[in-house]
């Protein structure tokens, strides 16, 4: 309804002026609203500071007395209230920016409107001028008419009458023209005034709607803060109720208690007798004034203790420690003690000093005659199992060096050489595994591909360890980099053929090739690849022959694992088909692995992300920004069908934040740490967030789909870090999982690696082809896919297998594995084919799986920005890997 077009007319035509001045009041009201919100933000900020001061007052409460634990409840509640009001201050400041921005836009709109309604202003002025001339013309016409009538009544001459009539006609014509001008100006004014009134009303409606939206944001922010304050008060009341009087008394008694033993009654006779005996002992044990040098040990120094190399008696069994040292007991403790030659009553000598203990070094036994290879291997295994490797090639062992200088016989050199060889093999084997998980040999340990149940996304095998942003690469915080060995193509060590291999493909025994097979360790580490009867040397057109094994590698397998005193590096997480494993297990990395990495410079170039960085030291009371690190880890699950380009894809992600160990002292001290706030940007694709309810706060009223703001509960974060510090006090950094998220991605460009499979199953021949292609548009930044493996299950007896290119056969799991080079935009597609002759009828198609990882980007493109001061981002790590990545025919 046009209110302005109906209510702003009138005789004096002041409606336009009223409307124009009303519109000009819009920027003024906007500025006044900004001033009001700014004053409210100042009040909230002052209140937040007052609550922080109150929290500090509560934290400085006396730790004595039974009421002391309740001060912590007050402190936590005050911190949360201060945080709520501080967050409201931040929201109001953002709202002020929006109001001021709207005020600037309003000024531009008014300037444009003024140019549009200037014609209406001219029409108003013209109508006003015509309205002023019209009464004058009418008055002139009336006067001329009255003069003509007066002359007619006076019977004046005809000449005078003609003059009067002429003047009357001129006045009438002037009045007629004035009326016409007025009507024309009135029509023009009415039309332009109506248009301007409608324009002013539309502007006012837009202005009021925008102002109402700003007021709604203001009210919503205040309401959310009040809801949070209510939750804080409810939590405070619940905490007060949970802390019972009995609990306070028990805590005080346990922490400040002085003991449970009560003083017993005393008997005078027993007490006096005990005092008399004690006095006699003191008198007998009292020594006269003793001058230095009068002691027998000082006057007659004993000869130095000689090292006894004699064999012990056959009838005695001396105590021998684990390193071959025999400790002779102190002679003062023997049952047949030497009779004292001196009086202990008035002796000036210190005869009660403890005697020196004697160390008997067990000599090296005589070499045994030559024995059988089995016995020699067993003895070598027992000897190598007790060895302890030094920390590095340049390290020293002070205990043994001093004893070697004293004449300890040297151990045989063959055992350390063999053990170091085995250690090098195991170290290379450990670093040769996938950086984020084992190969695909363990991807389908419990999967049944014959049914359709294996095609559902019911599990998410994780090749990453979510407990650290860097897994094994990075501790997350600002210190010099140290290269760590990574996976290398030439570090896969083949294993000899297993007894389950077919007779035609079984590898010849080691003895047949002149290689003596040493005994295997009790718990050998699983090898990275198991060629078995189908080795890497498979050629198209012929039967597969076993790959020749390296004799040095075989000898290295004989040595059992060693206990290393070197720095421990976190090893990748083992994949499983159950829930994601979140534990990070340590793995020894010996000096041999480091030397191997130095011998192959390509290690470092291939593992640019495998860099270990030590944590930054955080000095207590430092005024610098505290360093933190974050990691985005995502897992893509995809299911393809035949040659169809579309697929079902789902991505799950996790945000982990890493804190240095020294930050725990800063968080636990005074003043309290600043609130850690951050903003996730580019979150449009994310469908669901699951924040850590104990640590993370968020604003549910945020309407921008591109961003998501969070801030941490500093009290809960401090408590969580303290728990980790208590559980692992030697850790250099601590990881906290803050939130998880997930989203679905339709379309052929939704996954980084497109797969298609085709099976041709006949009675005498089975042919399988797998095609793959790189999709750079699936990631935020195109990055190569590393550790790419394609797995083809073959669950039936077959013969005459042909592969293009060569693949690895796992006999136990009955599957083929193609290990591909890094897949990127350059040469990012290929075709794999396999054919065989089934021995038990036509083959049954099975889903083909893929595994890969990528560093430096994510599929979602989400990023993190710190909000506020007090913290700095040391590192942001981004990576993704496969979960269930399948293609069926």
UniProtKB/Swiss-Prot annotation:
Residue ranges of domain MHD in the record: 625-888
SUPFAM superfamilies recorded: BAR/IMD domain-like (SSF103657)
Coiled coil: 156-195
Cross-referenced SMART domains: FCH
Disease per UniProt entry: Immunodeficiency 76: An autosomal recessive immunologic disorder characterized by onset of recurrent bacterial, viral, and fungal infections in early childhood. Affected individuals have T-cell lymphopenia and variable B-cell or immunoglobulin abnormalities. Some patients develop B-cell lymphoma, others manifest neurologic features.
Tissues of expression: Predominantly expressed in lymphoid cells.
Pro residues: compositionally biased ranges: 496-511
Membrane topology per record: Peripheral membrane protein
Keywords: Coated pit, Coiled coil, Disease variant, Endocytosis, Membrane, Phosphoprotein
Protein name: F-BAR domain only protein 1
Amino acid composition bias (Low complexity), ranges on this chain: 450-469, 580-596
Gene encoding the protein: FCHO1
InterPro entries registered for this protein in UniProt: AH/BAR_dom_sf (IPR027267), F_BAR (IPR031160), FCH_dom (IPR001060), FCHO1_F-BAR (IPR042735), GMIP/FCHO2-like_FCH (IPR054713), MHD (IPR028565), Muniscin_C (IPR018808)
Quaternary structure note: May oligomerize and form homotetramer. Interacts with AP2A2 and AP2B1; 2 subunits of the adaptor protein complex AP-2. Interacts with DAB2. Interacts with clathrin (CLTC or CLTCL1). Interacts with EPS15, EPS15R and ITSN1. Interacts with AGFG1 and CALM. May interact with ACVR1; linking this receptor to clathrin-mediated endocytosis.
Ranges where the record places region Mediates interaction with the adaptor protein complex AP-2: 267-442
A biological-process GO annotation: clathrin-dependent endocytosis
A single MF term (Gene Ontology): AP-2 adaptor complex binding
Domain F-BAR: 1-248
């Amino acid at each position: 309804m046009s209110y302005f077009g109906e209510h702003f007319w009138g005789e004096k035509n002041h409606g336009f002026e009223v409307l124009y001045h009303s519109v000009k009041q819009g920027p003024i009201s906007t500025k006044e609203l900004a001033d009001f919100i700014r004053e409210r933000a100042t009040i909230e900020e002052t209140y937040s500071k007052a609550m922080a001061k109150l929290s500090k007052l509560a934290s400085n409460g006396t730790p004595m007395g039974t009421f002391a634990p309740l001060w912590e409840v007050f402190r936590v509640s005050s911190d949360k209230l201060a945080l709520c009001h501080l967050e409201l201050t931040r929201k109001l400041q953002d709202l002020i920016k929006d109001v001021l921005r709207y005020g600037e836009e309003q000024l531009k709109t008014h300037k444009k409107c003024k140019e549009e309604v200037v014609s209406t202003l001219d029409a108003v002025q013209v109508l006003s001028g015509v309205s002023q001339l019209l009464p004058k013309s009418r008055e002139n016409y009336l006067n001329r008419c009255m003069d003509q009538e007066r002359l007619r009544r006076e019977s004046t001459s005809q000449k005078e009458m003609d003059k009067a009539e002429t003047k009357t006609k001129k006045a009438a014509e002037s009045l007629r023209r004035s009326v016409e001008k007025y009507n024309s100006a009135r029509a023009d004014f009415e039309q332009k005034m109506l248009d301007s009134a409608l324009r002013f009303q539309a502007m006012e409606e837009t202005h009021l709607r925008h102002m109402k939206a700003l007021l709604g944001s203001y009210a919503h922010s205040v309401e959310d803060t009040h809801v949070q304050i209510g939750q804080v008060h409810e939590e405070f009341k619940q905490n007060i109720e949970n802390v019972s009087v009995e609990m306070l008394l028990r805590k005080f008694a346990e922490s400040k208690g002085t003991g449970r033993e009560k003083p017993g009654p005393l008997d005078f006779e027993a007490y006096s007798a005990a005092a008399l005996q004690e006095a006699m002992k003191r008198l007998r044990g009292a020594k006269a004034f003793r001058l230095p040098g009068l002691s027998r040990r000082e006057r007659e120094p004993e000869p130095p203790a000689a090292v006894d190399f004699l064999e012990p008696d056959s009838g005695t069994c001396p105590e021998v420690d684990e390193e071959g040292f025999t400790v002779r007991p102190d002679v003062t403790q023997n049952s047949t003690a030497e009779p004292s030659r001196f009086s202990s009553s008035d002796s000036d000598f210190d005869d009660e000093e403890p005697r020196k203990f004697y160390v008997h070094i067990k000599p090296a036994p005589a070499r045994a005659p030559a024995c059988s290879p089995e016995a020699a291997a067993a003895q070598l295994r027992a000897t190598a199992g007790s060895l302890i490797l030094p920390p590095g090639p340049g390290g020293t062992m002070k205990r043994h060096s001093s004893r070697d200088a004293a004449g300890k016989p040297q151990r045989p050199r063959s055992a350390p050489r063999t053990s170091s060889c085995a250690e090098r093999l195991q170290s290379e084997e450990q670093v040769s595994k996938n950086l984020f998980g084992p190969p695909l040999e363990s991807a389908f340990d419990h999967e049944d591909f014959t049914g359709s149940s294996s095609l559902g996304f019911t599990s998410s095998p994780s090749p990453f360890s979510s407990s650290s942003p860097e897994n094994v690469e990075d501790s997350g915080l600002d210190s010099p980099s140290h290269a760590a060995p990574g996976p290398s193509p030439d570090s896969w060590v083949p294993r000899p053929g297993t007894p389950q291999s077919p007779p035609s493909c079984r590898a010849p025994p080691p003895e047949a090739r002149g290689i003596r097979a040493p005994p295997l360790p009790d718990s050998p580490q699983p090898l990275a690849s198991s060629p078995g009867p189908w080795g890497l040397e498979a050629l198209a057109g012929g039967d597969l022959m076993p790959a020749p094994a390296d004799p040095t590698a075989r000898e290295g397998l004989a040595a059992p694992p060693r206990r290393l005193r070197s720095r421990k590096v976190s090893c990748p997480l083992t994949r499983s088909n159950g829930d994601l494993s979140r534990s990070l297990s340590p793995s020894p990395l010996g000096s041999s692995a480091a030397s191997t990495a130095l011998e192959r410079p390509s290690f470092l170039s291939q593992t640019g992300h495998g860099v270990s960085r030590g944590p930054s030291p955080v000095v207590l009371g430092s005024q610098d920004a505290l360093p933190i690190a974050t990691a985005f880890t995502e897992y893509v699950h995809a299911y393809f069908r035949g040659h169809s380009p579309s697929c079902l894809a789902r991505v799950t992600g996790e945000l982990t934040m890493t804190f240095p160990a020294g930050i725990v002292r800063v968080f636990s001290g005074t003043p309290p740490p600043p609130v850690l706030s951050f903003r996730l940007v580019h979150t449009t694709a994310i469908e669901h967030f699951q924040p850590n309810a104990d640590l993370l706060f968020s604003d549910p009223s945020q309407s921008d789909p591109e961003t998501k703001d969070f801030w941490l509960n500093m009290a809960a974060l401090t408590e969580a870090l303290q728990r980790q510090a208590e559980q692992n006090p030697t850790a250099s950094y601590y990881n906290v999982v803050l939130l998880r998220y997930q989203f679905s991605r339709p379309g052929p460009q939704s996954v980084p690696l497109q797969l298609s499979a085709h099976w041709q199953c006949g009675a005498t021949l089975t042919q399988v082809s797998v095609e793959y292609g790189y999709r750079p548009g699936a990631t935020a930044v195109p990055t190569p896919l590393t550790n790419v493996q394609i797995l083809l299950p073959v669950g039936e007896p077959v013969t005459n297998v042909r592969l293009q290119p060569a693949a690895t056969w796992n006999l136990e799991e009955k599957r083929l594995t193609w290990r591909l080079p890094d897949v990127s935009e350059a040469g990012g597609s290929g075709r794999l084919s396999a054919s065989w002759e089934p021995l038990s009828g036509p083959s049954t198609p099975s889903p083909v799986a893929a595994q890969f990882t990528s560093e430096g980007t994510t599929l979602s493109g989400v990023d993190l920005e710190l909000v506020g001061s007090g913290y700095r981002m040391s590192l942001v790590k981004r990576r993704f890997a496969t979960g269930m990545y399948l293609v069926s025919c």
